[in-house]
Structure formats: structure tokens, C-alpha cells
Regions:
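Bacterial Sec-dependent N-terminal signal peptides
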Residues: 1-25
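A generic structural signal for residues embedded in beta-strands
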Residues: 61-62, 135, 518-521, 550
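Acidic (Asp/Glu)-rich catalytic clusters
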Residues: 263-267, 290-298, 375-377, 398-400
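Divalent metal-binding segments
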Residues: 21-32, 37-286, 305, 310-362, ...
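Non-cysteine beta-strand/loop elements that form the S-adenosyl-L-methionine
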Residues: 95, 297-315, 402-413
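Short, charged, surface-exposed secondary-structure boundary motifs
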Residues: 283-286, 415-419, 551-552
Length: 556
């Protein structure tokens, strides 16, 4: 009898104790009834039916539905109805401000001929009659002729109004005579680090490449801060609809970085941005004087250099001549002494360095320069952006000095139609080697390079794994021996990008203590049929626990 009484008393005590603990903790929001992929280990993508408790923007607990809901109370319970939850997508290489500004210019993406380019310009000019006429997105490789356009037709349509339209990669542009005159480029001239093409009679063709293009762009009036603010607010909404919660802006001036910071502080901008400062003078000096810094939403600890141009405009620096232009290899943009001095200063001041390298000559040079500064294995996380054509003999250098290759998979599926002509049958096997690049260091951050490519990370995932364009071409995939498995592609869009951004302690996986940056999808990318990947719907995007996009009501 005494034992029974003791048992009853103990049971009452335990019950009372449990009642005291029931919903004893406060959360701001609880996301529940979800299939969660935490991405919290390099090879741990096992789905779990979990609930996530969030307070002050950070994840405070993750666990079984009953455990979280019995422990935490919250005024906001979000039932995700067994939808799939990943860490918020991270774009490891983009041009966010550049993309934003293209939204108010002539969109030339997808044009199938020069005539279509001219037609879009005429249409846009009717409703935008004043000032410079600018646009971006044409690609002569998508046209039947595959040759550069000239200013002849532009001059006929716009004899007085200045026109400058950039190629999709941003490394070349076409200008009419009015624009060339304003820039003082009436006659063909030599550019170090660039090229100005001519017609048969020796007069300018209107095509300016790399440094020559930059020279003309400097005379086009810059949008003011108010225009940039409006553009970025619109652009951010588009990114949230795609499930992006963080984006790298690869090459900004100090003033624009400060503008982004002010927008974060005012609440006009929510998306996390890794702002790589442009490594050109005088911006480089200003960046060194300020030093590396960060806030909860903005990281300004990286410097971006350009070592060469693009493959499409034949500006990528190759060791051997282009297969379709036998006298041409292009050139390295940067003086070796100046570049090495900048690397030494960046290393001393604690900056991350990222360098644009497309051609095998550029990749070889920068890998060697990095080695000279870094020495061996380290945690500086210096990056090579694009790593598009890499000699097999150079691959070992990535791992030896912990150099991170940062790639954009849709480049492979956009370039595959003509890249073989540029590089030849043998050398094309050295290009778009995503599998080999991943194996050099164990991670491979993925990005879009927007506005060069589409902003949609689902297209990044599809191109990385299926290696086809959006029409399903080629049927067997492009160079499938270099395709990523789906788990690696997901990690490349989440935790691996966070590692490359020096922000993996804060974002990139769903873990206690990290920011609650999430994306909710209607299907699992790891198991979806290949033909269904691009049909995936983003249902919700969450930044620091707050829903920034909700497909059910169009909420931003």
C-alpha cells in the first residue's frame, strides 16, 4: 500500500513538472508539418519531418512536431503541409545591382537575329524618347550568321540619339556613331586590355570589347541613387520569388556598397548581400582604406578582380590561339606587379580575393599568383570565379592552396552550341569541368552570373545535374561525365556557397543558432523526375524568420 502511494505521488510530481514545461518557451514563429533537408553536413541530405522554432530571426530549435509544439508557444504557426524545406538558396556569383538596372533598359535577351534587336530598340524608343538608348542581352552566337553586328543599321535608325547595347556577358557592346562621337571614339584606337573592331574601310564597326567597352560606358550618365533604390527593390522581389535569400554582387564600387547598407538599415532591402568591391582604381584604394566589414545582412570583405574577358566575345585569355580565330589568344587584363601587390595587401588586411578567370591562361596565372601569396592549405577562402577553361595539369593547385572554384552551371548549357568552335575538339574537354573542380577541394559553390544568365536557381540546379538547356537539348546531356549529383548541386546552392562567402556560421544550413533563411518548394529536387525539375514551384521564401514571398497570396 505504501509503495502504491509513493508511486501515485511520483506520478503526480512528474505530471505537474511536465505541465510546467508545457509550452514554457516563447518563439516568434513556428514552421511545422514540413519535410526538412537541413544540409548541415557535407553528405547529410536525409529528409526529416520536422518543425522549426524561430526567435529574433534565428533558429532556436528543430525537432519532431510534437516536441517543438509542446515546448514552444507562438502567435504565428505556419503549417507547411508537408512541403519540402531547404536552406534559403544562395547565389554565389551574381551582379544584383547590374541585374536591377537592366529592368529599366531594353531587354535583348533571347533575340534570334540582329533585326529582332533593332525592332526591340525601336519599340522601346517610342515610349522612352529621351537620352541615351541602352540595353543588354544580345548574343550573336544565337543568330544564324553568328557574326558581330555593326553600327550601320543602328545609324540608320538612330542618326542623332546615342545608342549603346551590351552583349549578354557584359564584355562587349555595340554603339552607334552618335555614341562613339560623344566618347571621342570617332576613329579606331588601341586599348590595353580591350579591343575596338573596325569595318573593312578601317572605320569603327561599333563593337567595343572589354576595356574599350568600359571606356565608352563611362560617358553614359549614371543612374542616381533614387533610381538604383527603386531598381533594387523591384529586383529583390524577383529574387525572393525564386527562393533566393542571399546573393553575391561580384564587383561594386564603395558608394554602391554604402547605398545597399543604407537600404538594409532603412528596411527597404532585406536580402542578404555579399558585396565584392571592384578591384579597379581608385575604388581599390578606397576599399583598402575602409577595411573589411560586415553587418547582419551585408558582407563587405571581398575584392573582385578581372583577369580576362569572356569566351563568347573571344576575350578569354587562352594559352593557344582560338580555334576559330587562329591569330588570336586574347590577353591578361592585369599588370602582374600591380596585381601581386594588391594580393599581398588584401592578404595582410584580411580581405578575401575573388578573380574572374575564363581562359586557361588566366586560370593558370591566377592559380600561381594565389599560391605565391597563400603558400599552402589555409582558411582564407580565396576564389576563382568561373574557372571555365582549366588545363588538367593545373587542377591540383586548387586543393594545394585551398582555392575555391566558383562556377555558374547555366554557362555550360548556354555556351555548348558554339564553345567547341572557340576551343576545338581537344580543348573543349578542359571546359566546364564541374565534377573535377568539385573534387579538387570538396566543395563547389554555384551561382547564376545574373544578368548574364537567368536569375532562377532551379535552372542552375538543372544545368548542373541534367546538363541540358530548358528545351531538353541535348537528349543525352552535355559532357555528362562532369555533371554534379543532385545532393552536391543542392549543397552548392546552400552551405557550400555560404562557405565560399565566409558566412557558413550564419546561413547555408538549417541549424540551431543560424538565421532562419528558408525556401519552401512543392517537390523534392533530389528525387523529382528530370523533366519536372524546372516545373518546381517556390511556395514560400523566408529571411530571418520573416516570409518575404508567399505564393498562396503573392505576399512580399
Amino acid at each position: 500500500m505504501r509503495d502504491l502511494l509513493q508511486y501515485i505521488l511520483l506520478l503526480c510530481f512528474v505530471t505537474q513538472l511536465s505541465a510546467c514545461n508545457y509550452k514554457s518557451k516563447q518563439a516568434d514563429v513556428i514552421f511545422h508539418n514540413a519535410v526538412v533537408f537541413t544540409c548541415d553536413g557535407l553528405h547529410d541530405n536525409t529528409p526529416k519531418s520536422l518543425a522549426i522554432a524561430v526567435k529574433d530571426g534565428r533558429i532556436v530549435d528543430i525537432g519532431a512536431e510534437y516536441a517543438i509544439r509542446n515546448t514552444y508557444r507562438s502567435d504565428e504557426l505556419v503549417d507547411l503541409k508537408q512541403a519540402v524545406v531547404y536552406p534559403g538558396f544562395i547565389d554565389a556569383h551574381a551582379h544584383f545591382l547590374g541585374y536591377a538596372l537592366t529592368l529599366s533598359k531594353v531587354n535583348l535577351v533571347g533575340t534570334k537575329s540582329y533585326d529582332e534587336v533593332l525592332s526591340r530598340l525601336e519599340t522601346f524608343a517610342l515610349s522612352n524618347p529621351d537620352g541615351w538608348l541602352t540595353g543588354r542581352g544580345w548574343d550573336q552566337n544565337d543568330w544564324q550568321t553568328s557574326t558581330y553586328p555593326t553600327l550601320t543599321e543602328l545609324d540608320q535608325l538612330f542618326p542623332v540619339r546615342p545608342v549603346a547595347i551590351r552583349r549578354i556577358d557584359g564584355h562587349a557592346l555595340l554603339a552607334n556613331s552618335a555614341a562613339l562621337k560623344i566618347a571621342g571614339l570617332d576613329n579606331v584606337r588601341y586599348f590595353s586590355g580591350g579591343e575596338m573592331l573596325s569595318l573593312e574601310d578601317g572605320t569603327p564597326s561599333g563593337i567595343l570589347i572589354d576595356a574599350a567597352a568600359e571606356y565608352l560606358l563611362k560617358v553614359i550618365p549614371e543612374p542616381d541613387d533614387a533610381d538604383k533604390r527603386r531598381a533594387m527593390i523591384i529586383a529583390e522581389k524577383n529574387l525572393f520569388e525564386c527562393g533566393l535569400t542571399s546573393v553575391v554582387d561580384a564587383g561594386l564600387n564603395v558608394a554602391d556598397i554604402r547605398l545597399i547598407d543604407s537600404m538594409h538599415k532603412s528596411g527597404d532591402l532585406s536580402i542578404r548581400i555579399v558585396a565584392m568591391a571592384s578591384g579597379t582604381y581608385p575604388n581599390l584604394d578606397s576599399t583598402f582604406n575602409i577595411g573589411p566589414w560586415r553587418t547582419d545582412r551585408l558582407i563587405a570583405e571581398s575584392i573582385k578582380f578581372y583577369m580576362d574577358g569572356s569566351l563568347g566575345s573571344r576575350g578569354a585569355a587562352l594559352v593557344e590561339p582560338y580555334s576559330d580565330r587562329l591569330e588570336h589568344t586574347s590577353f591578361l587584363f592585369l599588370d602582374s606587379t600591380d596585381y601581386c601587390n594588391a594580393l599581398l595587401r588584401a592578404n595582410e588586411d584580411g580581405f578575401q580575393v575573388a578573380t574572374h578567370c575564363i581562359g586557361d591562361a588566366a586560370n593558370h596565372s591566377v592559380l600561381n599568383y594565389y599560391h605565391q601569396v597563400l603558400g599552402g592549405v589555409n582558411d582564407r577562402r580565396w576564389r576563382i570565379e568561373h574557372a571555365q577553361v582549366v588545363n588538367p595539369d593545373d587542377l591540383w593547385m586548387f586543393g594545394r592552396a585551398s582555392i575555391i572554384p566558383s562556377v555558374q552551371p547555366t554557362h555550360a548549357t548556354s555556351d555548348m552550341y558554339w564553345a567547341g568552335e572557340r576551343l576545338g575538339k581537344s580543348r573543349i574537354r578542359h571546359a566546364y569541368r564541374y565534377g573535377d573542380l568539385m573534387n579538387t577541394i570538396g566543395i563547389l559553390p554555384l551561382g547564376t552570373d545574373m544578368p548574364v544568365e537567368d536569375i532562377d536557381p532551379l535552372k542552375t540546379f538543372y544545368a548542373a545535374t541534367i546538363r541540358k538547356d530548358v528545351t531538353g537539348y541535348p537528349e543525352s546531356g552535355y559532357m555528362m561525365d562532369q555533371a554534379l549529383d543532385r545532393s552536391s548541386a543542392l549543397l552548392g546552392m546552400t552551405i557550400w556557397s555560404a562557405i565560399a562567402n565566409n558566412n557558413d556560421r550564419e546561413v547555408g544550413s538549417i541549424e540551431v543558432g543560424k538565421w532562419a533563411d528558408l525556401v519552401v518548394l512543392d517537390r523534392n529536387l533530389l528525387t523529382a523526375k528530370p523533366e519536372d525539375i524546372l516545373a518546381t514551384r517556390i511556395l514560400r521564401t523566408v529571411v530571418a524568420g520573416k516570409t518575404t514571398f508567399n505564393a498562396s497570396n503573392g505576399q512580399h
